[in-house]
C-alpha cells in the first residue's frame, strides 16, 4: 500500500506542483501540504482526476499549535472508493488568516467547516452559512484552542424552578489549579497523600 501511496504522491507532484508544498507517506497514509490559495483548485483536481477520484470527503478538523507562527493546521481527509485509497491534506494558517471554503466542490463540507469555525474560530471565505453549530449562539471563545480554559467561562444548566436554561459563572468545588501546558513537563515537586512508599 505504501508503494501505491508513494506513486500517487509522485503523480500529484507532477500534475499539480503549483499546489503542493510538500508530501510524505507516514504510517501508511499520504499527507499533502497545500497552500490555502490553491486549496479549492487542488480539491477539485483530486475529485476529478482519473488517477485520484477522491469523491468522498470524510472529515475536516484542525490542530492548534500555539507556539508556531502559523498556529493552525486545517486537516482534510478524503477517500477514493474507486482506487481504495485515502489522502490527508494540511493547510497551515496564522490565527487571523481565512481558509477558502470547499463547499462548492464538496457540499458535505458545510457542517464540517461550521464545526471547525465553532471549535477553533477559523473563518472560511465563501461559506454559505458560517455560524456556530455545536455551542450556544452566545458562547464565548473557542473550546478546542489550547488557550481556552479547561473549565470554560460559564456553566449552563436547566433550572427546574425557573423552567429554563440558566447561565452562571463557573463555580468549582475544589481549588482551581493552573497548569502551564506550554512548558516541558518536569514532574511534580510534591507528594500527594497515599503516594509515599512504605518502609519495608
UniProtKB/Swiss-Prot annotation:
GO CC, alphabetical: plasma membrane
Entry coiled-coil feature ranges: none
Subunit structure as annotated in this protein's UniProt entry: NDH-1 is composed of 14 different subunits. Subunits NuoB, C, D, E, F, and G constitute the peripheral sector of the complex.
NCBIfam families: NuoC_fam (TIGR01961), PRK06074.1-5 (NF004733)
Gene that produces this protein: nuoC
Keyword Membrane included in the entry's annotation: yes
Keywords: Cell inner membrane, Cell membrane, Membrane, NAD, Quinone, Translocase, Transport, Ubiquinone
UniProt protein name: NADH-quinone oxidoreductase subunit C
EC number: 7.1.1.-
Amino acid at each position: 500500500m505504501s508503494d501505491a501511496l508513494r506513486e500517487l504522491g509522485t503523480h500529484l507532484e507532477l500534475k499539480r506542483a503549483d499546489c503542493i508544498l510538500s508530501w510524505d507517506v507516514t504510517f501508511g497514509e499520504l499527507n499533502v501540504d497545500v497552500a490555502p490559495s490553491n486549496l479549492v483548485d487542488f480539491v477539485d483536481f483530486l475529485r476529478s482526476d482519473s488517477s485520484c477520484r477522491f469523491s468522498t470527503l470524510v472529515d475536516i478538523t484542525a490542530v492548534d499549535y500555539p507556539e508556531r507562527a502559523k498556529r493552525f493546521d486545517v486537516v482534510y481527509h478524503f477517500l477514493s472508493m474507486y482506487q481504495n485509497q485515502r489522502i490527508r491534506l494540511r493547510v497551515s494558517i496564522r490565527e487571523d488568516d481565512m481558509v477558502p471554503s470547499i463547499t462548492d466542490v464538496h457540499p458535505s463540507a458545510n457542517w464540517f467547516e461550521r464545526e471547525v469555525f465553532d471549535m477553533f474560530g477559523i473563518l472560511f471565505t465563501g461559506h454559505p452559512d458560517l455560524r456556530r453549530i455545536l455551542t450556544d449562539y452566545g458562547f464565548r471563545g473557542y473550546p478546542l484552542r489550547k488557550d481556552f480554559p479547561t473549565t470554560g467561562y460559564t456553566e449552563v444548566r436547566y433550572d427546574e424552578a425557573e423552567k429554563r436554561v440558566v447561565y452562571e459563572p463557573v463555580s468549582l468545588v475544589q481549588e482551581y489549579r493552573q497548569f502551564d501546558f506550554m512548558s516541558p513537563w518536569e514532574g511534580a515537586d510534591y507528594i500527594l497523600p497515599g503516594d509515599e512508599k512504605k518502609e519495608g
